[in-house]
Every structure is written in C-alpha cells, then in structure tokens.
Amino acid sequence: MKFNLAFTTVVVSAACAAAEDITLTVLSDNSEVKGMAVSNTHEGAGLNYLFIGGTDGPTYTYDANKKAISQPFTGSYVQYLTAMEHFMAMSVSTSVDVYTFDGNLLALNGSTKNFYACKNTGDPYEYSASSYEVMYYASDAPSSCLSIQLSKAGSSGNS
C-alpha cells in the first residue's frame, strides 16, 4: 500500500509540474503589434478566434505532457488551442495539433515561424476589419499579413 500511495503521489506531482499558466504576447519588428497580448474573442459556438491587442491577455494553461494549450470555458468545458485551416482559435473540440516551446517561442507542429497577424480575414463577425487576427500559414501567407512569433510569459507549475 505504501508503494502505491508513493507512486500515485509521484505521478500526480509530475502531472501538476507539467501544467503551466502562461500568457501569450507578440514578437514582431512591426510596432503596431510588437509586445501586444494575444486574447480570444467569441466567433461561434464554443469557438473563440485569437486576436492581438492590449497589454494584458488571458491566462492559458500549457500542458507539456499533452503538448496542448487550454483555458476553462463555460461550466465544465475546456477550450483547446487549435489551428482551423488558417485561423488560430480556442475550441471545445480536442486539438490534434502539437504545441511545444522553443525557449519561450510557441511552436506549432515544430515550427515557430508560421504565425501571422492579419486583417480582413473573413472571420464570422468581421472583428479582423479593425483588429489583427492571429493566423497560421505553413506556406503562402497573404502579403498583407505581418510575420510574428508568439512568446510565452508564465508562472511555475500549477498546484
């Protein structure tokens, strides 16, 4: 019994240490978006698209074991960061994307270089007409988009 309790304690401690509260900010040479926070705005049922603005963004949870970024949603639901075609969004659907960090830079499926700040993206509520939206293009990003990287700031593990 002592072994099982000790083993369970180690496993639970490791799981807690793997979860980290973070915020995301923009790294860019462009002064319009440089240092701005990444937040998310409602665009559909259980779906929030990522936008850039302000200096204080929401707190997300990064789970290094699951390689996922999440945030609490309504009731007992959780939203996960996902790339939906080119739109970056928080969704109640589980993401198949793999999120890691190279230093403090967010990597999607191993790349830190394919994030963009774009306007007029065709998002459902047309928020991108006046705000930069975070988009992901593995290739052929529109020339009007700004190349960005997403950097984390955070605390130590959750408890």
List each model region and its residues:
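Short, well-structured hydrophobic secondary-structure segments
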Residues: 41-42, 47-84
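Generic alpha-helix signal with a bias toward terminal, lower-confidence helices
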Residues: 13, 36-38, 50, 81, ...
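Intrinsically disordered, low-complexity boundary segments flanking structured domains
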Residues: 10-11, 56, 137
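Extracellular glycan/ECM-engagement signal in secreted proteins
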Residues: 20-46, 91-159
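Signature of small four-pass
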Residues: 71-103
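Fungal secretory targeting signals
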Residues: 1-21
